[in-house]
Amino acid sequence: MTENNQDLKQNWTRHREGVVRAARGTQLTAKTWMTEAPLRMLMNNLDPEVAENPNELVVYGGIGRAARNWECYDKIVESLTRLNDDETLLVQSGKPVGVFKTHSNAPRVLIANSNLVPHWASWEHFNELDAKGLAMYGQMTAGSWIYIGSQGIVQGTYETFVEAGRQHYDGNLKGRWVLTAGLGGMGGAQPLAATLAGACSLNIECQQSRIDFRIKTRYVDEQAADLDDALARIAKYTAEGKAISIALCGNAADILPEMVRRGVRPDMVTDQTSAHDPLNGYLPKGWTWDEYRARSVSEPAEVVKAAKQSMAEHVEAMLAFQQAGIPTFDYGNNIRQMAKEVGVSNAFDFPGFVPAYIRPLFCRGIGPFRWAALSGDPQDIYKTDAKVKELIPDDDHLHNWLDMARERISFQGLPARICWVGLGQRAKLGLAFNEMVRSGELSAPVVIGRDHLDSGSVASPNRETESMRDGSDAVSDWPLLNALLNTASGATWVSLHHGGGVGMGFSQHSGMVIVCDGTDEAAERIARVLHNDPATGVMRHADAGYDIAIDCAKEQGLNLPMIGR
């Protein structure tokens, strides 16, 4: 590390008033759809309907940003509008650093966000760089320009609740209720997911503005005045067999321990506060939000200490629920790790959601496949919904999800859809969407992407790769290989990030997006990318010894030299 202590901070702006919104229709701002697509999706990430704090470039997840600062944002936009189809833009932690001649089948944008040499991969070091304007936290889909609002995690949360219901309650959540906290960009999916799974939910959130937004977008049904009111509503609705979501404004570190003291018994307990980032994402008990934000600047070490201590009380309450026989699980925000660091030695006694409920899906390459209509026309999404049902006719669970999504999910920004499908299905759907663009059935191209939370694209020992069968939880070669393969296969843009979901030092992960513009060239790229991308997930799990993945690899004809030798 350099010993030069000179302040390297340059003139840059993190706050700017105004509204960013992606263009709609077929008129291009950039030269072709291959560059128009990343331009629109970048802007869509900052749409007020989508982003948590667009004036600060924050999309979701604490400080997950779409660009490092507004000067960088402007230069990214300028670069994309000028980019040719044989050039590639390089983005380093939200800053456009170079345009290079490549070729038409190469990605138009390559993105690396928040990556630090492992020894220095801590929030403390990252925050120093961030304060100097030398870094940006990209979360997962914030800095990779494929966030679609809370819908992006609704189905994954729904699948988790459904599987938990199958394991613990004979597949029936009617008359049951989920206790959780956090109504930000990710946590905001929980109330709707619980409702769709047939359960009531009590959702604690410390910011009233977030509750207001989730009620406005129909992710939350109603708000309780206080804990007594919330519990009365829960008792009423569960007795009636209704699946109603209830928000309660307060601090989970206060409310969960109080519920334990009262002997309240939820049917399921989890959490999706932004505990991964104690400096920016978790309000210490007894503090106001304004006090928290001000002291995060003036006393960062004290803020982190106070936030972690509150997390410890939160986790101790979750452990008490588990010890009372209530299914309790971590939903991927690293709150167990934070609590363990301040003395809760048994914080990991309750499992993460992936090993508990999701890993069998990952073994078959099934994960959060998503697409967005660049036209801005909801009819384009409804037509693709119908195409999914046509091409996957026998999956009643998937059809039910699509029907519920159309009925209950409000689009945020550009219309989009998510559905969990796997190896074989993704390429089939992508090629069909491309043909729909070619024929004019869709009014403009669509982009296909996914969360970085997928079967082959992440190493996260406290989340996606927790408790791997062979002990390879922390091996991060896999997301690097995924990014390299997607680049070689011709994805339109590819990203490689660090720290998403669980915070600095705890994850590495990659993403890809591909454009369906109706051309033959796009079809060739789609066939490669949408096969190879989920195939890396099957490969990764087969390599770890999972029989489901080994069988899937054989069924799909994957060439895995060390499997079945």
From Swiss-Prot:
Pfam family, any one: Urocanase_C
* Cofactor binding annotation: Binds 1 NAD(+) per subunit.
Q: Where this protein primarily resides, as one coarse class?
A: cytoplasm
Region ranges (Disordered): 453-472
Q: Which GO terms describe its cellular component?
A: cytoplasm
What EC number(s) are associated with this protein in UniProt?
Answer: 4.2.1.49
What InterPro entries does the annotation carry? Answer: Urocanase, Urocanase-like, Urocanase_C, Urocanase_central_sf, Urocanase_CS, Urocanase_N, Urocanase_Rossmann-like, Urocanase_sf
Q: Which GO terms describe its molecular function?
A: urocanate hydratase activity
What is the required cofactor set for this protein?
NAD(+)
Q: What is the stated purpose of this protein? A: Catalyzes the conversion of urocanate to 4-imidazolone-5-propionate.
Quote the PANTHER family the UniProt record gives.
UROCANATE HYDRATASE (PTHR12216:SF4)
Similarity comment text for this entry = Belongs to the urocanase family.
Output this protein's name. Urocanate hydratase
